[in-house]
């Protein structure tokens, strides 16, 4: 995985707290998997041929999020550039977790149960062009583990029911007043 050492993680100059979390999570998981700690910088730094671009960076290489629904994201890779961008900051974080699952082989089963690939197994294809839109605008499960905002983000849950979210994990969706279920009468 020496090829990875040439990379930098780049977020926008005015990145939101959740986009900074997304860049930090990518850095943390790549370091845990490979032992290589990539630097994180903002887009004011000069471009390099090997970058992970997180969110709206202003760089010419980007992922196309046009036409995606709320919380949609896109992942694009060509050569040494990989862009992960969402329709909002929270969906950029979802895109990072999708990238780690789909191309990194990571599995997030519970707050204290994650399966990460061996360093030798971590490989990226030369080209990626994925676009993802959630089928449902409101997503939740009533499972104690998912009440943790950090773990809920890995599951791409956006409900505020029994969760205390903060700026690091993005805004949540509130639905049908203070109810979680049996909401028909509230509509």
Regions found by a protein language model. Name each.
Residues 1-74, 120-129:
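Acidic, contiguous N-terminal accessory segments
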Residues 17, 22-25, 29, 66-187:
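Feature activates predominantly on carbohydrate-active enzymes
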């Amino acid at each position: 995985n020496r090829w990875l050492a040439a990379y930098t993680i780049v977020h926008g100059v005015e990145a939101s707290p959740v986009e900074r979390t997304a860049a930090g999570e990518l850095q943390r998981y790549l370091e845990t998997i490979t032992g290589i700690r990539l630097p994180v910088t903002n887009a004011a730094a000069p471009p390099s041929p090997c970058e992970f671009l997180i969110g709206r960076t202003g760089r010419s290489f980007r992922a196309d999020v046009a036409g995606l629904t709320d919380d949609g994201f896109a992942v694009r890779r060509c050569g040494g550039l990989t862009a992960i961008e969402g329709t909002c900051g929270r969906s950029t974080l979802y895109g990072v977790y999708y990238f780690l699952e789909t191309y990194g082989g990571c599995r997030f089963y519970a707050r204290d149960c994650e399966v990460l690939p061996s360093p030798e197994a971590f490989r990226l294809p030369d080209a990626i062009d994925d676009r993802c839109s959630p089928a449902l605008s409101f997503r939740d499960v009533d499972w104690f583990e998912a009440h943790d905002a950090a773990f809920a983000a890995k599951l791409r849950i956006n409900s505020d029911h029994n969760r205390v979210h903060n700026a690091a994990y993005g805004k949540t969706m509130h639905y049908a007043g203070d109810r979680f279920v049996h909401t028909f009468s509230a509509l």
